[in-house]
Regions:
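A short acidic/small-residue loop/turn micro-motif
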Residues: 36-39, 94, 163-166
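Active-site glycine-centered loops adjacent to acidic/histidine catalytic or metal-binding residues
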Residues: 117, 143, 329
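A charged helix-plus-loop insertion that forms the helical arch/lid used to bind
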Residues: 84-96
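ATP-binding/phosphotransfer module of carbohydrate and carboxylate kinases, centering on a glycine-rich
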Residues: 1-69, 80-85, 102-110, 127-134, ...
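Short hydrophobic alpha-helix segments
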Residues: 33-35, 90, 160
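General beta-strand structural signal in soluble alpha/beta enzymes
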Residues: 112-116, 150
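Short beta-strand scaffold segments in enzyme catalytic cores
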Residues: 18-22, 146-151
Length: 335
């Protein structure tokens, strides 16, 4: 007799679009669809595309005769874990303090779990990806801002002494001033926004490389008369472009990777004393440049001045990539 297939509905709320999927107990995506993220709407209007997508997943599961055992949601913000509500979701403020789990459990009669997106990504990697078999994990994602999560034996560590506002962890005393008022925060040194500013400085210095020329050509192709050269480059800069040029040997791109690698190494060194992670999982579009960033981070953790514990941290790339938070949002449901 064939065992009934168990699946869970995963909802990964993103800035441009939200992914909703059916995930099986092995972490495989069995069916998925996308729902538009509607900003600036009342809460029920914001949730409507997600609810419709969940309905579609449940209809598909019924058609396939799959047993649905729960719903997992990852959100890009902070949570009130006691009330199981989003606490602060800056891009979707109508969700703030809304009883999202209660609504979903009432509507679908399924147990529902809510996670911060970076925590969900860590759970995905722990159960099904690059974190399998590791007791003490540090997960670091480099996107527009920097996010981090820590786990011991698969349990996310939520102590404010550890992750907290990770993007505001100071890693350089003389670094750029951050919006929080401090200097040298991680967000000012290794986020995608920080990398964009590095490119802008290269443009102002007049450095002519393939990367800077591509950005200048993109800016000039849309007009921009009367604007300083390169002033519109933020519109075209991306992790994929940076990685592509770094792989081709572009000096500016490779210098950015070197600086980011040193910054990540400094951040990990700060965590070692608090947490002693055994493995660091890196995620984000900048990993598209093969092992370039991984090599830089490993090098920064193995300098003569590095502690023995730092040099023992294993540095690996994410295995689940963009699906990490999606898969991780339902991983505890199967545990």
């Amino acid at each position: 007799m064939q065992r009934e297939q168990s699946v869970a509905v995963a909802v990964d709320i993103g800035g441009g679009q939200t992914t909703v999927a059916l995930i099986d107990h092995d972490g495989r995506v069995r069916y998925r669809c996308s729902a538009k993220t509607l900003r600036g709407r009342p809460v029920l209007a914001t949730l409507d595309p997600y609810l419709r997508a969940i309905d579609t997943m449940l209809e598909h599961a019924q058609k396939e005769d799959w047993h649905v055992c729960g719903v997992g949601v990852s959100v890009p913000g902070s949570l009130d874990h006691t009330s199981r509500r989003p606490l602060l979701v800056s891009m979707l403020p109508s969700l703030n303090s809304f009883p999202l789990c209660d609504l979903l459990e009432t509507r679908y009669q399924l147990p529902t779990q809510l996670h911060v997106d970076v925590d969900a990504a860590l759970l995905g990697e722990y159960h099904f990806g690059a974190g399998q078999g590791c007791r003490r994990l540090l997960f670091l994602t480099i996107n527009a801002v920097v996010g981090a999560a820590l786990a011991i034996d698969g349990q996310v560590e939520r102590s404010s002494n550890y992750t907290g506002h990770i993007c505001h962890l100071p890693i350089a005393t003389n670094g750029p001033r951050c919006s929080c008022g401090k200097r040298g925060c991680m967000n000012t040194l290794i986020s995608m926004d920080a990398m964009q500013k590095m490119v802008q400085r290269a443009l102002r210095r007049g450095e002519e490389t393939s990367l800077t020329q591509r950005l200048l050509e993109s800016a000039s192709s849309v007009g921009g008369q009367g604007e300083p050269k390169g002033s519109r480059n933020r519109e075209y800069f991306s992790a994929q472009l940076l990685a592509e040029e770094a792989m081709r040997g572009d000096s500016v791109a490779q210098q950015i990777y070197a600086e980011v690698g040193r910054g990540v190494g400094s951040a990990v060194a700060r965590y070692v004393g608090l947490f002693e992670p055994h493995r660091l999982i890196l995620s984000g579009g900048v990993l598209s440049a093969g092992n370039l960033l991984l090599t830089q981070v490993r090098r920064s953790l193995s300098t003569p001045s590095s502690s023995r514990v730092c040099s023992m941290v294993e540095v690996v790339p994410s295995l689940l990539g963009n699906d990490a938070a999606l898969v991780g949002s339902v991983a505890p449901i199967f545990s």
